[in-house]
Amino acid sequence: MNLKEVFDFYKGKRVLVTGHTGFKGTWLSRILVNAGAEVTGYSLNPPTDPALFQMAGLEGKMNSIIGDIRDLAHLKQVFEETKPEIVLHLAAQPIVRDSYKDPVYTYETNVMGTVNILECVRLNPCVKSFLNVTTDKVYENREWEYGYREVDRLDGYDPYSNSKSCSELVTHSYRKSFFADGHCAISTCRAGNVIGGGDFANDRIVPD
């Protein structure tokens, strides 16, 4: 699929992006805005100063809502008001080192936060597609020379990686339990490490 096909698909669609103030979420939101989508973002305040979200010029070009995905009541309100057709779930506690410092917050955000988003998807038939963006850290680390496959075992052991493995299991459970008839497409994708302009977070491979 080329960029024109992406733009044609998203033009005019109501899209909810969780984690829109983060690095990946900001770039994704900018692409969607440029494609002509009606974008709503739901996230904590930008995690860095300077913040890519402000630098990208997205304020005023999308519906930016500051909130915590652990807050189910607020999420329900947002879904009811915005009626998204597509939900792209990127919000997370994303730092391995921070997960050792505060594992409870990491699990609450990455596991129960995902449950909350999926529950809102379940309750709102306007949603036709949900994507949970996780990480390549979900795999059991076998220390082998070749790349991991989608069918390889999940066994992230640190709190961050494990919470993302759990997030995938939650997504799988909801897909089998509530969306087996296909009225809403439920999927996950596993992102690797990324680099790019505006990445000011700690512990990055190439920080800006």
Predicted regions and their residues:
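N-terminal Rossmann-like NAD(P)+-binding domain of SDR-like oxidoreductases, especially those catalyzing
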Residues: 1-191
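Glycine/proline-rich active-site loop of Rossmann-fold NAD(P)-dependent oxidoreductases
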Residues: 124, 165, 182, 195-208
